[in-house]
């Protein structure tokens, strides 16, 4: 089967990591899978980058205005304190359906595509009539723009009065949800959710009422993320084997929903236990952290072992193996990669029972699930596992067994394969085509051998009419005004630089004139018969502008004392030329 997979970024974040795993496992099952993305991974052979095709200047200006208004400014300037997770209306994107690139494929799998594909662009891909599977890494495919709703259930209604926006004069989230319900309601468009929780939310939204929602858990490399000897793993990262360790990590620890503040409270509650306090005082406990750390962690009064961003699976597996407990204090989450990875490495997790986490963690069996964001209860659970090695080891074994049973790569790939076949996709055996097939005509090749396709940005008709069209035109006018302001500022800056250069040159001229022999020789004359120019260097005040300095130079050059010394200056120059000619042997 020929499958095109779409994702904004092939390298960073949990969604791209899960996407790459699925691509690898589908490829191992014999399918030809290409990744189409904005930010390619140079390590991936079948990775096509999308670059913007330049239109005429007026069209480009309007496209840029649409991006700034709908994809950037409107939301950014109105965000409330409810959440700092990305909010992407997904209204402007690249038009790939007409590029010729997609003709050779049998099916399409669309992952995290904010700032890449728009709602309307996805609908155009679906209009090609081939199976389209939208893999849900968060809630964005079925909300008015939020990637996580922060507890709001507006997606089940109409997304009006969005709590993540302070004000919403265009009622944009409501319009986005309406467009999704209209454009994604096709029998060949199916959503795949990794967890029952996310699948239930997607079904509740009504966005996929035609193609439906299927639950297929994500997967993990069970041959890479494996249990290791904890003493050896601790030694490998520079720790004493006897130290108790708890691990916290996320790609972006500053994201509010990841619960970093909860972790700080958990650590504080743990200090109430005399045994933990004794370990802390003696250096017998360490907090391990990876990802983008925050200053608050250092303020916890625990010894911190910051592992930074880890982009190597072997090093990451070592970090998990070095931990006695993995702490997952998220407020909102789907099926965190870090949870699966920790469990695969035999490290029991302690997490809040949010989102899809209870699908994987069975409380008291392969980890602990804490309800209600009770940080004191989470602290007690972490403490118990740190101080009861036998119980932690039993949970570790159960965690590994759960991963081996439900989350291997091939199991996820087989389920996707069955879904695509059920949606009417052609099997690999029935499509013997040359690699990339008729899509070759749409491809360009870089000097480094990489492949890319050029596609224009597309602004849907829905945004060019009515109140949205009015707002877009106002944004275009504002962009024009801002561009003119930038041009004028550049002109002023250049003028100021020229003025500074002229002023410096005049300073040098004045310095030379006022220290010349002609000027010094007539000092007595000036004191008696010629008064200095008021406000000049010759008087008491320093000139403040190039115009004043120029006037001063001209006054000096036309002064009586300067003119009286003209014959002497001419005689001096003649003598100087004569002396040079004598030295050069030009005069015998």
Per-segment meaning from a language model:
Residues 331:
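Aromatic "clamp/platform" in nucleotide-sugar-dependent glycosyltransferases that forms part
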Residues 363-364, 368-375, 384-389:
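Conserved acidic donor-binding segment of nucleotide-sugar-dependent glycosyltransferases
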Residues 239-258, 264-268:
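Conserved donor-binding/catalytic core segment of Leloir-type glycosyltransferases
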Residues 348-351:
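Short hydrophobic beta-strand element within catalytic cores of glycosyltransferases
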Residues 318-323:
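Short alpha-helical donor nucleotide-sugar binding micro-motif in glycosyltransferases
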Residues 280-286, 290-317:
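Nucleotide-activated donor-binding/catalytic signature segment of Leloir-type glycosyltransferases, i.e.
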Residues 430-588:
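Boundary detector for helix-to-coil junctions that initiate low-complexity/charged tails
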């Amino acid at each position: 089967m020929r499958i095109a997979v779409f994702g904004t970024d092939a390298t960073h974040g949990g969604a791209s990591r899960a996407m790459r795993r699925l691509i690898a496992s589908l490829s191992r099952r014999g399918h030809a899978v290409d990744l189409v993305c904005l930010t390619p991974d140079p390590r991936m052979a079948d990775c096509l980058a999308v670059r913007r095709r330049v239109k005429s200047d007026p069209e480009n200006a309007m496209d840029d205005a649409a991006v700034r208004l709908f994809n950037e400014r409107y939301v950014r300037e109105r965000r409330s304190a409810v959440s700092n997770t990305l909010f992407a209306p997904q209204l402007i994107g690249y038009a790939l359906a007409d590029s010729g690139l997609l003709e050779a494929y049998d099916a399409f799998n669309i992952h995290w595509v904010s700032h890449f594909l728009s709602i309307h662009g996805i609908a155009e891909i679906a209009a090609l009539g081939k199976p389209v599977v939208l893999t849900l890494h968060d809630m964005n495919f079925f909300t008015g723009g939020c990637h996580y709703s922060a507890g709001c259930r507006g997606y089940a209604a109409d997304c009006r009065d969005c709590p993540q926006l302070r004000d919403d004069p265009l009622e944009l989230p409501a319009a986005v949800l309406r467009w999704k319900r209209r454009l994604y309601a096709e029998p060949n468009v199916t959503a795949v959710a990794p967890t029952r929780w996310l699948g239930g939310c997607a079904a509740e939204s009504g966005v996929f009422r035609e193609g439906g929602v299927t639950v297929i858990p994500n997967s993990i490399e069970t041959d890479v993320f494996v249990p290791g000897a904890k003493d050896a793993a601790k030694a490998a990262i520079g720790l004493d084997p006897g130290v108790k360790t708890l691990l916290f990590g996320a790609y972006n620890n500053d994201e509010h929903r990841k619960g970093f503040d909860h972790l700080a409270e958990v650590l504080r509650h743990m200090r109430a236990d005399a045994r933990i306090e004794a370990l802390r005082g003696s250096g017998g406990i360490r907090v391990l952290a990876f990802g983008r750390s925050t200053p608050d962690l250092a303020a916890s009064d625990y010894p911190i072992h910051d592992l930074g961003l880890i982009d190597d699976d072997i090093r990451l597996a070592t970090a998990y193996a070095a931990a006695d407990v993995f702490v997952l204090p998220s407020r909102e989450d789907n099926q965190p990669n870090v949870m699966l990875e920790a469990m695969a490495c035999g490290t029991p997790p302690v997490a809040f029972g949010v989102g899809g986490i209870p699908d994987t963690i069975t409380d008291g069996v392969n980890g602990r699930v804490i309800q209600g964001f009770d940080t004191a209860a989470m602290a007690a659970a972490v403490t118990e596992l740190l101080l009861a090695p036998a119980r932690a080891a039993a949970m570790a074994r159960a965690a590994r067994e759960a991963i081996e049973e439900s989350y291997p790569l091939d199991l996820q790939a087989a389920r996707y394969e069955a879904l695509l076949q059920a949606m009417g996709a052609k099997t690999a055996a029935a499509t013997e085509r040359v690699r990339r097939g008729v899509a070759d005509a749409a491809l360009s090749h870089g000097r480094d051998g990489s492949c890319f396709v050029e596609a224009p940005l597309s602004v849907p008709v829905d945004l060019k009419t009515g109140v949205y069209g009015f707002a877009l035109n106002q944004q275009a006018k504002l962009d024009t005004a801002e561009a003119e302001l930038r041009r004028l500022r550049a002109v002023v800056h250049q003028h100021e630089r020229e003025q500074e250069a002229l002023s410096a040159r005049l300073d040098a001229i004045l310095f030379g004139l006022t220290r010349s022999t002609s000027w010094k020789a007539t000092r007595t004359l000036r004191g008696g018969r010629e008064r200095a120019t008021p406000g000049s260097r010759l008087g008491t005040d320093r000139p403040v502008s190039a115009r004043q300095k120029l006037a001063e130079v001209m006054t000096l050059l036309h002064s009586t004392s300067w003119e009286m010394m003209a014959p002497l200056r001419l005689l001096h120059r003649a003598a100087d030329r004569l002396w040079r000619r004598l030295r050069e042997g030009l005069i015998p």
